[in-house]
Amino acid sequence: MDSHNFPNLCLMKLSAYHKARGDTLEWHDGRKHYDLVYMSRVFTDSYSKDYSGTIHADCIIRGGTGYGLNNRLPEEVEHTCPDYTLYPKFEGTAYGFLSRGCPRGCGFCIVGEKEGRRTVAVADLAEFWRGEKEIKLLDANLLACPDWERLLQQLAQSGAMVDFTQGLDVRLITPEKVEMLNKVKTKMLHFAWDNPEDDLTGYFKRFSELTTVKDYRKRRVYVLTNYNSSHEQDLYRIYTLRDMGYDPYVMVYEKPTAPPITRKLQRWVNNKWLFRAVLDFNDFDPAGWEKRKNNRK
């Protein structure tokens, strides 16, 4: 059982593992009794409440970062090709990690504690890709991996459209790495500009000069807010990225504690039609745009 909003990689691996053993699987039904129930939770109570319904089972196994950072899949499950039929509406897309870990150790991020402060290769593409047309790569910092060239080569040779979902580290960009990235069929590149004290403009400009991905819609940058930044610093990063040909996307840390202006900023930036139609945040009137939208219905 999970939230179903995004394919759960661990559950897909568990499904494949149990099916290979001849076990019968289904999504949880509160009216039934089971030998075993797996519960997966990505977020803590700040973002999602735990399941409070009745579970009839001989054994319940809870996993995911929402339950803690120390739970791990057994090795024989971790390296099982996911059962993509578990989520029929997402079939045709492969999900997985080629590397784990990140050397940055950012205070807002759990990756360093959970996966380690070194990026290491953990799988080849063939472990979770079987010819799907699209690959969603979940690596936290692929470019920090010593095996980056070999792993990017595998992505390029696949011929699949690749979405680098978790943010390539723009500070680690080199001509050699961009040359290899240019060989990958790219659906979406994601970067991040989390710390307003870090001036990353030079890195982003350098990448723009080297990359063959010129469409700003494929060059998304996560902008962290509500974490040691002022509203003015948030706006600076957003305007600067847009001016350089990138597509900013506001992430709000501990959203329940965020001030109204930060929530308004997220609404403006992440609605891409609004963000391109209203060029200045000070001109964004949520009530006015909501009224216009209702009048068009």
Can you say where each PLM-predicted feature lies in the sequence?
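Core AdoMet radical
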Residues: 3, 38-42, 110-207, 217-227, ...
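A general structural detector for well-ordered alpha-helical segments in enzyme core domains, enriched
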Residues: 14, 49-56, 151, 176-180, ...
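A short helix->loop->beta-strand "cap" motif at the edges of active sites that frequently abuts
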Residues: 55-63, 160, 215-217, 246
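Ser/Thr/Gly-rich flexible loops in soluble cytosolic domains mediating phosphotransfer, phosphorylation
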Residues: 58-85
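A structural motif corresponding to the C-terminal lobe/cap of the Radical SAM core domain
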Residues: 183, 188-190, 197-297
